[in-house]
Amino acid sequence: TDNGDGTYTYNVPVREGYTWSDGNPITAHDWQFIWDTVTGLNLVGNWLNAYPYLCEDDEGNAKNCVVSIVATDDYTVSVTFNYDPGLSTWQYGAAQGPALSKAYWESIATDRDSLLAHDAIDAPVSGAFVYDKLEQGAFYTWKYDPNTMWYGGTTTIYDAGGTSVDWDNGKAPAFSGDFGNTTGDSFSYETGPFVGTVEFTLYSDQDAAYLAFQNGEVDFVLNPLGVKRNTFNQLAQVPGIELVQNDPLGMRYFAHNTRLFPGSD
């Protein structure tokens, strides 16, 4: 919605009937709570990717930001920007912003230090796994929640780029829908989980992690950085490992100067 004053608002419905793992309902108030917490306690890091609330730069100049997130009723979230947001800041930004359970976190998030110091091992989640054990510097596990509603369903991917979802497990509110162009050849897969426990082994560096991978001790490595060249070359020598890489120094973004020809045409 164009509010006519330079701001734009998205009114997003929250489907009723979904719950956190502790049984509390997931509502629009959870999104307003996390917005109030992020802005009230000046949380930064990844929170700014989803909820860029800083509307001025270091020199006091105005910049694009989220102005407010409000629960207009129990199942509607209104997100307001001070500009008309594009794909990266709406669809891949605030529209995918996380929420946390207000019922659990409200008494904890009273100040920044208390929030960051809290042991969240028992925090409720919206998923099939709950937090289990954490051994600092060694491992971290998730375990399957037998009472979860977050399981099952069929997802179909089409050659034309579209996706279909059919989810009716008898516990969560049933949902089905088609997104994009659902024509052409397709393949489908069932959503799990198909295991009872997931273990994340913690390693001190890449070398140790990829050595464990080579030895079959772990199934994959979660690595926020690129693979080092010598590690890449070592993996290339291991039978059964297939390597896929992007073109080095390739183009990631392409920009047009719309003020000059041909971009202005």
Predicted regions and their residues:
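N-terminal lobe/hinge region of extracytoplasmic solute-binding protein
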Residues: 1-5, 124
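Extracytoplasmic/periplasmic ligand-capture domains
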Residues: 6-46, 59, 65, 88, ...
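Surface-exposed binding/hinge segments that line
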Residues: 11-13, 32, 48-111, 117, ...
